[in-house]
Amino acid sequence: MTAAGGPLVVVGDALLDIDLDGRADRCSAGSAAPVVDVAHRTFRPGGAGLAARLAAADGAEVVLIAGFAADEAAARLRGLLDRHVRVVTLPLRGSTICKQRVRAIGPWAAPNGHTRARQSRRPVLITRIDSGAGRIRADPLPEEAVAVLTTARAVLVSDHGGGAAAHPQIRKLLRAHADHVPTVWDPHPRGPVPVPGAALVTPDHATALTLLSGRLDDGPDLWKLAKGWAVDAIAVTLGTEGALLCLRASGKRLRIPLPSVARAPDGGDTCGAGDSFAVAAAVRLAEGRGPESAVRRAVLAAAEFVGAGGAAAYSETEPVAVREATADWDPLRT
C-alpha cells in the first residue's frame, strides 16, 4: 500500500514549545521553591509542527495541514515553519497552544524545590506551564488541503488534542484513500479513534495504558483494539525498551527492542522522540515497506533523535534580561 510521488502530509495540531533556561542558585524564602534567573528563551515548533520539520529534514517534500490562530504565538510558529515546509492553514478558534518548560542548573535546580540538589551539567526540568486552548473549527476544508490529502504519498496524523484529528472532512478523506495511501496515526489520550484502514497507530506507553484500561502485555488486548479500530497495526512506543508491535491480520505480537549500540546516553532530552518515531514509520511505509520494517526503523530513528540532542536542532534561541523574566513569565514578551 503506497502512493507514488506526492508529498508526505502531516495533518494535526501545531504547538509552540518554549524553554526558559537559567540558573537556580537560591530558593524562595516563603516556600523553598527554586528561583530561576532566566538566561535565554528558546522557541521551536511542537506537535504536528515538529513532526513536519522532522519529515522535511532530508529535503523531502512535506506539507503541514494545521490550525493557526491570529496571535503572536502563531506568528512565531509560522516563522519557525515557513522556511522549511509548505503550510496549509486551517481556521483555529481560540489562542495558540504553548507548552513552556522552565529548566535550570545550579544548587537549587530540583523540581521539588525543598532541598539543595546535586548539581548536574544538564538543565533540570523545574516545571511546565501550558497556555492556550485553540481548537480547529469544523469548517469546510480549503481546496488546497483537499488536493494535498488526495495526492499524498503518505499521511501522518499528529493528534495533540486540538481538533484536527476529529475534523469530519479530514476523516472522510483519510478513509477514502486509506487503501492506497499509508496513514500513520499518532493518537492523543483524549482524541478521537483512528480512522479505519490506518496502516499504523503509534500510542506511547501511557496512552496505550489508558486505551487498555491500565494493562499492557503480550496478551490479546492489543489485537482486540486493532480489530475494533480496523487498523492494520499498532506499535506501542516504550522508550529505551523499543516498541511492542501488534499486527491485526495475523494477531502476531512482536517486541522490537532498541539495539544496545543505538542506545542514547542517559539524561538526553526525549521531548519530540514520539514525533520522530511516527515520522520515520510514515516515511518507511511510503517506501512500500511493511509495518514491522517501519517500526524497526522508527525505533532506531527515535534513539538517534535523542542522541543527537533532540528537538534542540529545530529551535531558535534569544537572550532574556533577568529582570524581565522574573517579573513576568509571558512566554512571548520580548
Regions found by a protein language model. Name each.
Residues 1-4:
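A short acidic-Thr-Gly-centered motif at the start of a beta-strand
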Residues 64, 87-90, 200-205, 253-258:
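Short hydrophobic/aromatic-enriched beta-strand-loop microsegments
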Residues 8-10, 183, 201, 234:
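Residue-level marker for buried hydrophobic side chains located in beta-strands
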Residues 132-136, 151, 168-182, 188-197, ...:
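Conserved phosphate-binding/catalytic region of the ribokinase-like
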Residues 13-14, 160, 276:
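Active-site metal-binding loops of divalent metal-dependent hydrolases
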Residues 24-35, 98-139, 149, 153-224, ...:
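Conserved beta-alpha-beta core of the PfkB/ribokinase-like small-molecule kinase fold
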Residues 6-8, 16-156, 313-334:
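Conserved N-terminal subdomain of the carbohydrate kinase-like
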Residues 12, 65-69, 187, 238:
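Short beta-strand/turn micro-motifs composed of small residues
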